[in-house]
């Protein structure tokens, strides 16, 4: 039996040390990430189908994502290229070349004429023609007849020059226009027409026409580079052919032909090879969630144990809501996929706010909204149902903001009512924005779902709060109200065993609550902390003056050192008793810290008078000093109440002087050095305590003592 007990104690010790270990929160982050991945992957994993070519589809199949249809895109690009006509370019240099050619023909004839005129012996016509032809290229000789050469050789200088200029002008005019190869004949006819219209003597017209027609060639020629550039431009302007997300690939009872089968393959519906992207994306998103949480929690000034507890608490609430969403999502169908509106999503954010704080609650709302938009994505195009995501986000954040700084049970119910109203309005607005074709009955049903979600959130919160408070030792308003019940065993113990201490504690509670509320601290925590701050006095009630009724003071018979030990021990005794009753740490701290390290002056000076060799440190409380505003304010209220109670004929001036003196002494003694009270707040505390004490110790009418008896 002893062995088993030792083993249990050892394992408990190991768990406690692990709970305080830095590796604990790393493990919690990894565990939360793994749970998120397990619950979300099934909703982002692409659907795969077992279908055969030329089979009949048993359902309408939609494209799960937008993908490019490369085959169709290439076909469209090729069609665009084929539609581009050949590109031609007007070669202006061809005009100059042909004019030069015409000039060279006339120059050759002119040279032969000049040579024959200068010679002593006139050459024969035949030899002159031969001389001209020798000067011309073969293609010119093939195109220009000897008769034309002879005619021009016989022309006088004036006619020769006129014919030359007229042919050059006509060629230039015709060649200045585009002459494609298929229009060459028309261009030659045009130059002939030009020549005929220029009054060339009839005997030269044939020769001029022959040279003019020969000079005309196609100048509007095919340009391969321009054609290729145009085709490339046409190809580049073709938009990608895409299979859009949500596009119908095949209708129910339709044949799956080769084209449909190709599209099913293209969208990844026939194989599992396209898992890399969704897995990677989901891991990145979860990584961002965890990184944000790490950043938030690492900034919190908490010891390792409470940081681990906060992470665990957040993880449990988040997992709980994810599981609820997963269960509800099992009932969604293609024809009715709006069941997600029923999820009490606000419960998660409000629970986090009640048990932790508002900032992390809003972060939790964002994470749950994104996760919910993935879980309820059936029947929508894409992985995310943005409508449900917006609904979840507004629902969660509105609940957190409406709750504010209050968390009484009645306020939670009011918050549920408010969230129900907000949900109803959000559902209606989203449906109107979508311009949905739903009937009035269907819209009403969805709005009713939002109302149910709001009420369910408040019920879930009230039901779960006690479990979280007990399991994590969290101090909430409901827990404080429960501990402030006069029927609590420890309060009954204080009342019955130390009635003077009980009355003192109630007075301190009233004072400290008012002071805390004046500086923005937790007034209810201060009230309940004050009720239990002197619990340790129940161990030796008669040694404390407020409980010494009709008995001698036992300290008169004790040494100052022994009296000091008895008085000082009440802080640690009280803290230990509260721990044994599993009280929240905040209340234990108040019991332990309400005297800080202050000096027990009465017994210190008594010992000094006796001549004992002592130091101040021996007569100081062990501390620690107050760590919170509430503990510091209770320490002031405790001293003030005791001092004012012992004051003879208290009046406002004397009370204020006493209060400010006590605060000043504690400040100079360094009792506030470890809490975050400011000088301004200390002044506010002094004013509030004075005002409260003046109300308690106000002047009363002095009734004369009845000294005469009625005869």
UniProtKB/Swiss-Prot annotation:
UniProt-annotated binding residues for Mn(2+) 2: 534, 570, 594-595
Catalytic activity: 3',3'-c-di-AMP + H2O = 5'-O-phosphonoadenylyl-(3'->5')-adenosine + H(+)
Top-level taxon: Bacteria
SMART domains in alphabetical order: HDc (SM00471)
Gene3D superfamilies in alphabetical order: Hypothetical protein af1432 (1.10.3210.10)
Keyword Manganese assigned: yes
Region annotation (Disordered) ranges: 114-133
HD domain: residues covered: 501-643
UniProt KW keywords: Cell membrane, Hydrolase, Manganese, Membrane, Metal-binding, Transmembrane, Transmembrane helix
Binding, substrate: 504, 621, 638
Documented EC number(s): 3.1.4.59
Spans traversing the lipid bilayer: 275-295, 311-331, 336-356, 360-380, 384-404, 413-433, 448-468
InterPro entries, sorted: HD/PDEase_dom, HD_domain, HDIG_dom, Metal-dep_PHydrolase_7TM_extra, Metal-dep_PHydrolase_7TM_intra, PgpH_phosphodiesterase
Membrane topology term: Multi-pass membrane protein
Cofactor(s) this protein cannot do without: Mn(2+)
MF terms in GO: cyclic-di-AMP phosphodiesterase activity; hydrolase activity; metal ion binding
Chain residues that bind Mn(2+) 1: 504, 533-534, 638
The protein's enzyme class: hydrolase
Compartments (UniProt record): Cell membrane
UniProt GO cellular component terms: plasma membrane
The protein's role, per its UniProt record: Probably has phosphodiesterase (PDE) activity against cyclic-di-AMP (c-di-AMP); may be the major c-di-AMP PDE in the cell. In B.subtilis c-di-AMP is a second messenger that mediates growth, DNA repair and cell wall homeostasis; it is toxic when present in excess.
Family: Belongs to the PgpH phosphodiesterase family.
Protein name in the entry: Cyclic-di-AMP phosphodiesterase PgpH
Organism: Bacillus subtilis (strain 168)
């Amino acid at each position: 039996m002893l062995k088993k007990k030792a083993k249990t104690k050892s394992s408990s010790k190991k768990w406690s040390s692990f709970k305080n270990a830095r590796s604990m929160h790393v493990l919690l982050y990894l565990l939360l990430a793994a749970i998120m991945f397990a619950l979300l992957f099934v909703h982002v994993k692409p659907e795969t189908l077992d279908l055969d070519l030329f089979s009949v589809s048993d359902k309408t199949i939609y494209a799960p994502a937008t993908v490019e249809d490369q085959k169709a895109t290439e076909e469209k690009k090729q069609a665009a290229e084929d539609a581009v006509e050949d590109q031609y370019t007007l070669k202006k240099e061809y005009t100059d070349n042909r004019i030069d050619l015409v000039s060279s023909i006339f120059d050759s004839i002119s040279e032969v004429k000049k040579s024959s005129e200068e010679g002593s012996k006139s050459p024969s016509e035949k030899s002159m023609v031969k001389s001209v032809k020798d000067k011309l290229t073969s293609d010119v000789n093939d195109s220009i007849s000897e008769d034309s050469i002879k005619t021009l050789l016989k022309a006088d200088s004036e006619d020769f020059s006129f014919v030359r200029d007229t042919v050059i002008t006509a060629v230039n005019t015709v060649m200045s226009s585009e002459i494609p190869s298929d229009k060459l004949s028309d261009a030659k006819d045009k130059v002939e027409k030009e020549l005929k219209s220029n009054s060339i003597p009839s005997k030269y017209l044939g020769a001029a026409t022959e040279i003019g027609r020969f000079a005309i060639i196609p100048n509007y020629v095919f340009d391969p580079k321009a054609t290729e550039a145009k085709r490339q431009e046409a190809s580049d302007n073709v938009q990608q052919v895409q299979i859009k997300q949500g596009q119908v690939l095949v209708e129910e009872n339709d044949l799956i032909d080769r084209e449909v089968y190709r599209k099913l393959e293209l969208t990844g519906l026939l194989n599992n090879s396209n898992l890399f992207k969704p897995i990677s994306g989901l891991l990145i998103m979860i990584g961002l969630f965890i990184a944000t949480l790490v950043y938030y929690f690492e900034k919190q000034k908490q010891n390792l144990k409470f940081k681990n507890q906060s992470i665990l608490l957040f993880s449990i609430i988040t997992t709980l809501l994810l599981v609820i969403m997963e269960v509800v999502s099992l009932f969604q169908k293609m024809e009715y996929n709006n069941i997600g509106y029923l999820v009490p999503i606000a419960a998660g954010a409000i629970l986090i706010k009640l048990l932790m704080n508002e900032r992390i609650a809003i972060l939790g709302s964002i994470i749950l909204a994104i996760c919910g938009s993935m879980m309820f994505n059936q029947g929508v195009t894409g992985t995310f149902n943005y409508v449900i995501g917006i609904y979840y986000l507004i629902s969660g954040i509105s609940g957190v903001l409406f709750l504010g700084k209050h968390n009484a049970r009645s306020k939670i119910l009011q918050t549920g009512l408010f969230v129900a109203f907000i949900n109803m309005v959000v559902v209606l607005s989203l449906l109107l924005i979508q311009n949905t074709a739903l009937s009035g009955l269907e819209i009403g049903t969805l709005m009713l779902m939002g109302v149910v979600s709001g009420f369910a959130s408040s019920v879930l919160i009230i039901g779960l709060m006690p479990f979280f408070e007990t399991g994590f030792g969290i101090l909430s308003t409901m827990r404080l109200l429960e501990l402030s019940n006069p029927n609590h065993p420890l309060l009954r113990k204080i009342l019955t065993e130390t009635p003077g201490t009980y009355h003192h504690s109630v007075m301190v509670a009233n004072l400290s609550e008012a002071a805390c509320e004046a500086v923005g601290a937790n007034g209810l925590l201060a009230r309940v902390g004050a009720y239990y701050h002197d619990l340790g006095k129940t161990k030796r009630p008669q040694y404390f003056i407020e409980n010494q009724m009709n008995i001698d003071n036992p300290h008169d018979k004790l040494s100052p050192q022994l009296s000091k030990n008895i008085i000082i021990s009440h802080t640690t005794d009280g803290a230990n008793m509260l721990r044994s009753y599993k009280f929240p740490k905040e209340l234990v701290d108040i019991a332990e810290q309400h005297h800080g390290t202050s000096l027990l002056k009465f017994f210190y000076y008594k010992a000094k008078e006796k001549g004992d060799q002592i130091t101040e440190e021996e007569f100081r409380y062990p501390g620690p000093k107050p760590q919170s505003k509430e503990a510091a304010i209770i320490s002031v209220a405790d001293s003030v109440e005791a001092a004012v109670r012992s004051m003879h004929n208290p009046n406002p001036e004397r009370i204020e002087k006493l209060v400010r003196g006590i605060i000043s002494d504690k400040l100079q003694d360094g009792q506030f050095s470890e809490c975050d009270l400011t000088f301004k707040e200390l002044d506010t505390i002094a004013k509030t305590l004075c005002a409260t004490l003046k109300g308690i110790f106000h002047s009363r009418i002095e009734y004369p003592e009845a000294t005469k008896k009625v005869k």
